[in-house]
Amino acid sequence: MAEIVAAAGVPHTPAFPGLVAREGPDSETAQLYGQIRAHLEEADVLVMFDSDHLNTFFFDNLPALSVPLAASAPGTNDGTPGMNNRTVPLAAGLGTEVLAGLTERGYYPSRTAKLSMDHSVMVPLHFLDPGERMTLLPIYLNGLAPPLPGAARCLALGADVGAIVEAWDSPLKVALVASGSFSLEVGGPRIADNAIAGVPDVEWVKHVSQRLKQGQAAELVAEATSDRMRAAGNVGGELLNWIALLGAVGPRPVEVLEQQAHLGHSYAAWTWS
């Protein structure tokens, strides 16, 4: 059976690849991603909880939950600076298992047979798999367009995804990843003049990071209402990706937690051994 070997949460700021290209491997961003990457070295497959930024899906067909079944997908589809476009191999067999397993458990995921991926997937992949050796299964949660999925449902979803992965008839090793920030406003009214993004709720970032540090998933779920997440920014629902990850992690303590509250996010890692 497949084995989960690690879990991690990272931001996907689209400026980061270009920033690291300019500043080099000693930059703070490169070092933080490097810490997380070290925890994922055993993995053959990355399962990534992600919220698309209306580049893979749009309002005419925007699922609350979607599992790709494609064998590969190109990215980036949004012109992220500092990155080369490439075609990423997807774990279609695992996708089929996850789709079936979640449906049997009472979820209603859409299936995606053809897709392209934006920076929310490709930036983490750029830093966590620079050798391009892993296959990927993105699991899309709607974290942007209300109504958002409930936090408790996302926690349960993560636990079920973990169980499905561990029951997958495969010798491969799997790492689970959450992609996103805790507080972020993009192109909205709560940013500085002449800025394209900002962090409207630094204290929420600190609070969420403390919940992660203390392993308080249930408390975080109770606090992460749709209104509370939206108060943290128009993409504050990306927190749901982290909550899904916590469902899979269970009671395991976090091993790495590096907070960048002024940027709206943290980096975190858990290992299973």
Tell what function each PLM region has.
Residues 52-54, 182-183:
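Catalytic metal-binding/acid-base residues of hydrolase active sites
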Residues 144, 159-174:
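Non-transmembrane, aqueous-exposed alpha-helical and coiled segments at domain scale
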Residues 184-188:
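Secretory-pathway/luminal and periplasmic proteins that interact with or process carbohydrate-rich
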